[in-house]
Regions:
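Glycine-rich beta-alpha loop segments
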Residues: 9-143, 148-150
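Glycine-rich phosphate/ribose-binding loops and adjacent secondary-structure elements
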Residues: 144, 159-162
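Short, Lys/Arg-enriched N-terminal segments with co-localized hydrophobic residues
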Residues: 1-7
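Active-site/ligand-binding-proximal alpha/beta "capping" segment
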Residues: 163-171
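Short, hinge-like loop/turn segments at secondary-structure boundaries
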Residues: 135-137, 155-160
């Protein structure tokens, strides 16, 4: 049955008695929790997911998604006030192609102008833009694929390289 104007609730309004008390106690015990109102909502969402969904794959996806998003915030957080440009391009572009040189020069000019460069962290155009910007001005947001790219040498080992399991988190 489909309800036409169904709206997803983004805030939990129903009280949960002892569960609310336990969550509040957990937040107090954890100490140093920033924005406890949001942490409380995330804990409630996790508990509700565990109650409502018994599908292992769904729960694994939610768990991994939250972990990837948390790590992304940790990596990008120190650069919150630094402007960034995302460069998209083929991993199959060869260094001897003119467009490779253009991407490299573009990355260099962005870094000189105070921008950081975000790429998919792969080869080709992505590597060229990272090379131009240099490792200190580069982010790589890679994806784990069974047959595809590894991180390019510019971002490999860089603390600003994030390797995702899910494409939707990478975007």
């Amino acid at each position: 049955y489909y309800k036409e104007n169904r709206v997803m609730q983004l805030h939990f309004t129903k009280t949960n008695g002892p569960v609310d008390e336990a969550i509040n106690q957990l937040i107090r015990i954890a100490d140093g929790i920033h924005r406890p109102e949001y942490v409380r909502e995330m804990i409630l969402a996790a508990l509700k997911a565990g109650q409502e969904d018994d599908d292992r794959a769904d729960l694994k996806l939610m768990n991994t998604t939250l972990k990837e998003m948390r790590f992304t915030a940790k990596v990008f957080g120190p650069y919150r006030n630094v402007r960034k440009v995302t460069v998209f391009g083929s991993a199959r572009t060869s260094p001897d192609e003119p467009v490779y040189d253009m991407a490299q020069e573009f990355g260099r000019k962005l870094a000189e102008a105070g921008y950081m460069v975000i790429t998919g962290g792969g080869n080709g155009i992505m590597e060229a833009a990272n090379e131009g910007a240099g490792p200190e001005h580069s982010f790589g947001v890679n994806i784990r694929l069974p047959f595809e790219q590894r991180a390019n040498p510019v971002v490999e080992g860089n603390p600003r390289l994030i390797t995702y399991k899910y494409f939707f988190n990478r975007k």
